[in-house]
């Protein structure tokens, strides 16, 4: 039996993820007029562009909701964000600049916590504002059904009747005004923005063109660092971790992780840290483009990665990075709570993050321009005396190194023999500018 309802289930409770914006406001009132019993659920994700959460459920009641609840998701959001940080669950990068998967993390939290609240109220039909071309429709589908196996999905934007009657923002605005709500449609921006406490996503409209760049974006979590008239002074900041958890910024300890991340956002935001422009593959494999902000996570990530490289050995770091990229894809696909994701995440948290204790001092300048000034940790395996060029007591002698190099003759001989074979069969034809050894066949020795 299909879990997708293509028409409005009249006479039944329908939960809607309610942002208070034009789309969900019009959808809620339309459902009420058409005979459904709408319930509104609003997630407080610490969105930097929302200044009055308490007013949102009140508006939902005015528009016809039989019930409206505000769900505080901030603590869970930050907990999942730090888990992603600890496991390096970030697979989208361009030239070393990272997208921190802030929207996928937000969807994992929203999709589970709102549906859990609906289930408490006996609401087993859920709608939201995601479109059929995007990632969120699948993310919410997966997370919702994980929490409530009896859940049915109704999305007004998949209902042809709704589309025919209220297919655009102008029609929605007129509909709300005619209903007596004096709803003023906000001014159209050149792009769409979605945000939470971890970061902001700017995409669509003018940003669909790769001829448009970051300069058309007005940041909501930091400064437009590319503008000459924006003055940004260099700033030194210290970040301290204990057993993989960020605990202090500039010597100030935080018992509340939400407050710590808010302060990290303020510090990083003063410099435009963590902004990136990415081309990515959506879940359906079509490419999309987004410009992202994540000043706080970026700041914490710099310090965390510095400690990872100073504490763990090469093979552990390599496995951490490989697993992190795989986990990032699973997170992006809406599989953050799938068994394979839990396995990868908990492996990193147990065997990588638990050893990360220390403090890193960073100088922030403009955008992603920074320098690491100092690194301290009781767990460092970096010991400069082991490789010092000065005359110090050493853990190995020149004769030890001669023996080690002599043992390398075995694999060097194997490599030389393989290169000769490749040359004989025509796979290697070194040119004049090639750095390949001039390996010849047996007859040319």
Curated annotation (Swiss-Prot):
Predominant localisation class: cytoplasm
GO biological processes: argininosuccinate metabolic process; L-arginine biosynthetic process; urea cycle
Residues bound to ATP: 17-25, 43, 129, 131, 136, 194
A single GO molecular function term of this UniProt record: ATP binding
Binding site residues for L-citrulline: 99, 135, 139, 192, 201, 203, 280
Residues at which L-aspartate binds: 131, 135-136
Locations listed in the record: Cytoplasm
Catalytic class of the enzyme: ligase
EC number: 6.3.4.5
GO cellular component: cytoplasm
Catalytic activity entry: L-citrulline + L-aspartate + ATP = 2-(N(omega)-L-arginino)succinate + AMP + diphosphate + H(+)
Keywords: Amino-acid biosynthesis, Arginine biosynthesis, ATP-binding, Cytoplasm, Ligase, Nucleotide-binding
PROSITE patterns: ARGININOSUCCIN_SYN_1 (PS00564), ARGININOSUCCIN_SYN_2 (PS00565)
InterPro entries: Arg_succ_synth_type2_subfam, Arginosuc_syn_C, Arginosuc_syn_N, Arginosuc_synth, Arginosuc_synth_CS, Arginosuc_synth_type_1_subfam, AS_cat/multimer_dom_body, AS_multimer_C_tail
UniProt pathway annotation: Amino-acid biosynthesis; L-arginine biosynthesis; L-arginine from L-ornithine and carbamoyl phosphate: step 2/3
CDD domains: ASS
HAMAP family listed in its UniProt record: Arg_succ_synth_type2 (MF_00581)
Subunit structure: Homotetramer.
Family: Belongs to the argininosuccinate synthase family. Type 2 subfamily.
Entry protein name: Argininosuccinate synthase
